[in-house]
Amino acid sequence: MPTIDVHKQDLEELVGRKFTIEELEESLKFVKGEIDGVSGHELKIEIKSTDRPDLWNVEGIARVLRAHYSKNQGIPKYNVIKPELTINVSEKVKKVRPCIAAAIIRDIKIDDDILKQLIQAQEKIAGTFGRRRREVAIGIFNLDKIVPPLLYTATKSDGLKFEPLDGERKMTPAEVLEIHPKGKEFAHLVNSHDVYPIIIDGANDVVSMPPIINSEKSGRVTKRSKNLLIEVTGLEMRNVETALNILAMSLADRGGKIEQVNIVDSRDNIIVTPTFAVKDFKVDKYLIKRTFGFMPSDKEIKSLLERSRYNVVSVDKTDDGHVHLQFPTYRQDIMHAMDVVEDMLMAYGFDNIEPHYPEFFTQGELKPATVRNRKLREIMVGTGAQEISTFILTNKKNLFEKMNLPDDEIVEIANPVSSNWSVMRSWLTPSLVELLSKNTNVEYPQKIFELGQCVKLNTRSQVGSEEMWKMAYSEAGSKVNFTHAKTILQAY
């Protein structure tokens, strides 16, 4: 779970009130957080939520707490300045790292707390939400050192030389990957391609080599920097825009002014970022009643939602009606009405719900499948294999194209939030191969297995599909062959 460092006085100034440690511990329940350590005025706060990157900095925590302790409720509103800066996107970068979004923050007064939180948020979001920069990487620059317009393109390994941040001399992209510490750490993200992403300004100076490193010239942000450029690159625009919005909001909460940026692709299509769009949503009042154990009044429902940073459009008068609401697009975690009701419960306070004894008791036991699975795991671990656990959601490319197989009929998601998670897996082998491909830098031999659920179409089933348990084993090494793998199966 993400753990962030926070200066208590900084948090109090952002919220607009003071806290004792006990009061703060209680208030952090609104963000699924708890104090993990105290050293003077420095706090370590653990956020027990891996799907709320907007809470992984002090500004995000303060944004939620302000809604509980002031009239500043509902979806936060941010004024934006119309764009002047343009980033042109070359066709060359499309197959390497296709998505980019950017924002300008003007007139920001940077102190030690802001600089510390900015760096921390950048690392937490890119590291966790961005899957160690694979899905999302963030660059923050001193705008006054950049000559517009910018070009996001791709270059060869011996392309434009530049001095990377904390570097000692100018280097080619290949040298950055071979010599610079960040280049060594993240080279695996780009070295499978014959060209590397790069951002160049109007003076033909390199601004950044995403997702690896910024340039020393414009990428060093200090307390003297007044105008910042934030750029986010990645594989899916939805994730890129979410990360950008979070950082832009955080700096706006510090007094900065948000200015949009034009993103122009090779076909002259223009996207303006950031945009603080909202989505409409409906929640059944019956679900609220069933979850709470009672039906809150319409006034209470509206108050709980606004304190949870939702806009309430309307509340139907009848108990079998709906609540019509809006939520910001950076809340990617909202996929079901229960996600909204959970926020309402946190705002109400779980401790305020009166417990009731169950009306009847039952005695449970392990299912036969669970007993079997435990035995299988014991056997596999006994052979020296390490168990892995991958997602049941995947995509057709992993299941078929990468396995050199024709497409087959499988269970697909009607409205996937990401093309990476658009189908249900029908077998486990691709998951093992994918993991091995991402761990080529780990010592060999590698022995892994997975025992997990798969899904196949079944027209005779009431839901049209059927779940089943499957197991797969894989071993990689210089002396591995089929005979060796067969002996593992004979362990049964």
Predicted regions: what they are:
Residues 2-13, 19-37, 41-44, 48-102, ...:
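Extended, well-folded interaction surfaces typified by the phenylalanyl-tRNA synthetase beta subunit core
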Residues 68-70, 101-280, 290, 386-492:
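TRNA-recognition modules of translation machinery and tRNA-sensing kinases, especially anticodon-binding
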